[in-house]
């Protein structure tokens, strides 16, 4: 059984911090707790619930020895997806997504074969028999292929699921997976479109600590199902003691604090007239008006 997730660890990683309210996607309103200084605060209870669902899927896929593709091409996810894949024997893409990676896998496999052939030529010493000019050209091609395909060069068939750090930034990857009915698990910040994702995980996708923690929770679930022992993650999962995206703590009188203060993972959330989701006393958001 996958490990229990606590609000405290999610809060320490900064998972709750969403984007500025003006940058939100209204489809994410059911995952939002409130607003703090014009920034949305994500409901961590929803995050835990959806993480639990994703854990169950990955644990099941692991038990069937199915392979997963981790996708994180934005800075906050590059290290997390690579580490997760290497620790669990899965695949990753942390540079630009090549169109057709899933939908045109046959062509991608041809390019992967070219990478293997260059590596084989190096290994057997045949590369050194070529001219310097040829060697330079071949090694440049190898570096290019390794950067684009190094994380999937062992992937000979479609993955059973993909885990995406930013479904908005890696929209092409998500669309390809959906077209092929491959389940999509994704961290959805408040500016994301959850309709494109099968397993929505509401959370901050910009803080490395937030991404590291969520990806680590997911890969641990896979390892649990696959019954493999992984090395501990070396990535940090506790955010610096500052609030990301310049979210400043609201200054309120003690009287107003008593009336307005609510807690989201020990953080003061300022309730404003910005659209927010009803959670306890939080006002429901109004639908966006047509222009």
Swiss-Prot record:
Composition skew (Polar residues), residue ranges: 251-270
Signal peptide: none
Pfam families: Ribosomal_S2
Keywords: Ribonucleoprotein, Ribosomal protein
GO cellular component: cytosolic small ribosomal subunit
CDD domains for the chain: RPS2
One GO molecular-function entry: structural constituent of ribosome
GO biological process annotation, one example: translation
Spans annotated as Disordered: 241-270
Matching InterPro entries: Ribosomal_uS2, Ribosomal_uS2_bac/mit/plastid, Ribosomal_uS2_CS, Ribosomal_uS2_flav_dom_sf
PANTHER family: 30S RIBOSOMAL PROTEIN S2 PROKARYOTIC AND ORGANELLAR (PTHR12534), SMALL RIBOSOMAL SUBUNIT PROTEIN US2M (PTHR12534:SF0)
Protein name: Small ribosomal subunit protein uS2
Organism for this UniProt entry: Mycoplasma capricolum subsp. capricolum (strain California kid / ATCC 27343 / NCTC 10154)
The encoding gene: rpsB
